[in-house]
Regions:
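A glycine-rich, Thr/Ser-enriched phosphate-binding loop motif common to dinucleotide/cofactor-binding enzymes
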Residues: 1-9
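Glycine-rich phosphate/diphosphate-binding loop of Rossmann-like nucleotide-binding domains
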Residues: 11-87
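Rossmann-like adenosine-cofactor binding region
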Residues: 64-139, 145
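Short, flexible active-site recognition loops that position polar ligands and cofactors
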Residues: 142-156
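A charged, well-structured terminal subsegment
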Residues: 154-168
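Conserved small/polar residues in nucleotide/adenosyl-binding loops
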Residues: 171-173
Length: 173
């Protein structure tokens, strides 16, 4: 439901038919599961958006979730011209490093420095967020932060899915 809410939010705020959406890895003190990045990537790949995934080497997502996304290991390059920035931490996926933290590089924290190279991008995160680790206060408190409307869209996404499930169950009665 979270990634569906994210899609609804992008649809509400996009200024072009094909926005550039960047999902960026960000540091976190604990290794987090890949569920949110994987489902976000699935929804983005189902759209006609320009979708870029950026992370340090070693944090690759499974190919079935990466899909047609461009993978860029240089975060600043990935952010160039972006319309939406979606920040999320995830643990390493492959090999002997599965589930581990390979980097706590604070240069990957989303800050004004990275946002300056975007197309005045909106900042997104599924919340709760580790301030000044995933994203700086300046970014999450900026007018370009849409984390609150994004969170509110969880109710809409849940309502849509529940309605559809109920409609399907009524068909079988």
């Amino acid at each position: 439901l979270q990634s569906f809410a994210d899609l609804i939010t992008i649809e509400e705020y996009k200024k072009t038919a094909r926005p550039k959406v960047v999902m960026t890895w960000a540091p976190h003190p604990r290794p987090l599961p890949q569920a949110v990045p994987n489902s976000f990537a699935e929804w983005m790949n189902a759209t006609d958006y320009e979708f870029v995934i950026t992370h340090p080497e070693g944090y690759e997502l499974a190919p079935q979730f990466v899909g047609n996304a461009k993978v860029e290991y240089d975060q600043m390059k990935a952010f160039e011209g972006a319309d939406f920035i979606y920040a999320k931490n995830w643990a390493a996926y492959s090999g002997d490093n599965y589930g581990q933290i390979l980097s706590k590089d604070r240069d990957w924290t989303v800050s004004d420095r990275q946002m300056a190279v975007t197309n005045n991008a909106y900042f997104m995160h599924c919340l709760p967020v580790r301030r000044n680790m995933i994203v700086t206060d300046d970014v999450i408190e900026s007018p370009q932060s849409i984390v609150i409307p994004e969170a509110a869209n969880r109710e809409i996404s849940a309502t849509v899915v529940l309605k559809r499930l109920l409609e399907l169950s009524l068909i079988h009665i």
